[in-house]
């Protein structure tokens, strides 16, 4: 696979960037998740970062990337509305995996946001998008800038939702390379990896949660529901971090 010039690729229209990365992505599809991480670390520019929501399967990508690149900055965008179990899971994994955790938050506290805007998550798609912009997108953009990131790893999988079904292993988002090492993994592969390495699902998985975000926009899975319907009242799947 040829070397990739981030600056040159960023000058191209989005469609042309996709085409420019097509050959590389075709080859990355043939590699294992570990090989994809190793390739990215060898061929893509640093600084390198890994983002995590510390959701249901978070231990997989955190363990996989961190064992190959110890001390990689792990970005968490904390809304202040995560489940208590999520905060406990963050502490547990940070200690167990010796994570270099970097927590980013909105400039306004949750209480101040509610005083200023009301409960944005109850204000339809527009309100949810504004909430996500304040609490997810802006803090992530700030994290990428402050950490001088040029290559960003994330744990998305195609099986999780229709909006992720056609994502490539390698793309450019927010001006940096974005690598999705486990994009083609199914639920069985995730389970097997967790078992092999003595890792756990998020504590709420045992209570029927397939996806975990904020307390006010996350629902338990019920028969007949798609996984994406358990988030944002079924109005949206993505929080904004992985769009654009």
UniProtKB/Swiss-Prot annotation:
Keyword list, A-Z: Cytoplasm, Oxidoreductase
Active-site residues, as the UniProt record annotates them: 239 (nucleophile)
One Pfam family from the record: PAPS_reduct
Primary residence: cytoplasm
Compartment(s) where it occurs, according to its Swiss-Prot or TrEMBL record: Cytoplasm
GO cellular component labels: cytoplasm
PANTHER family assigned to the protein according to its UniProt record, in alphabetical order: PHOSPHOADENOSINE PHOSPHOSULFATE REDUCTASE (PTHR46509:SF1)
Name of protein: Phosphoadenosine 5'-phosphosulfate reductase
Species this chain originates from: Salmonella typhi
Gene: cysH
